[in-house]
């Protein structure tokens, strides 16, 4: 996909770098697989902000994605690739031999007209989905389940890829991009290849308004606030005179907050430190 740097015809265009995808479908999405999406503005049912920096943005409709890929043995043909405003990856509309259509995360290299297959006997080819116990060690995969039958949870964003490095007993060991080594049940499914649109990270927004189109609001520094609004607020100058904390007083910058001890034994090696 070409990277296009805009000419500085205005202040808002000067620093814009766009990723152009000429292969994407230019019409409407497939209507039976589209749902209404209600924006929360970062508020919960009491109207209180529970997620900061969220609000506004262009109206979006949710595309129902098939993360389970459970149509075993039924070949599907990729009809088209589409843009999805709800995720960084592109999606593919697949027409199966039984007449059903489903959206799936588009793998890198898959084009309109390609055939996709799921099941234990599917060939090892980009876009096909198999249980990890049927995938050769060393294969790069994406859209990986963490519980058999639950649907893909890992490696779903643009350019994501995970390597299957070992298989022992009922578990398979995966190497994530972060450097973390993690075990998952060998019956969990994964899709061969990596996720499409790896150039997604090369986009430069060029102006604040481009972030607002996505529903992302400004991030204000705590030290620029008043004491009533943030532990870093107030005082003379920019020094807040204490260890940095979140707006709720929890230490930040290295303080561990992970609570899920239940799955600690599945992590073989922690992710690389930056």
Swiss-Prot record:
This is Large ribosomal subunit protein uL2. One of its GO terms (cellular component) is large ribosomal subunit. NCBIfam families: rplB_bact. Keywords: Ribonucleoprotein, Ribosomal protein, RNA-binding, rRNA-binding. Pfam families: Ribosomal_L2, Ribosomal_L2_C. Gene3D superfamilies: 2.30.30.30, Nucleic acid-binding proteins, Ribosomal protein L2, domain 3. PANTHER family: LARGE RIBOSOMAL SUBUNIT PROTEIN UL2M (PTHR13691:SF5), RIBOSOMAL PROTEIN L2 (PTHR13691). Disulfide bonds: none annotated. One of the primary rRNA binding proteins. Required for association of the 30S and 50S subunits to form the 70S ribosome, for tRNA binding and peptide bond formation. It has been suggested to have peptidyltransferase activity; this is somewhat controversial. Makes several contacts with the 16S rRNA in the 70S ribosome. PROSITE patterns: RIBOSOMAL_L2 (PS00467). Belongs to the universal ribosomal protein uL2 family. One of its GO terms (molecular function) is rRNA binding.
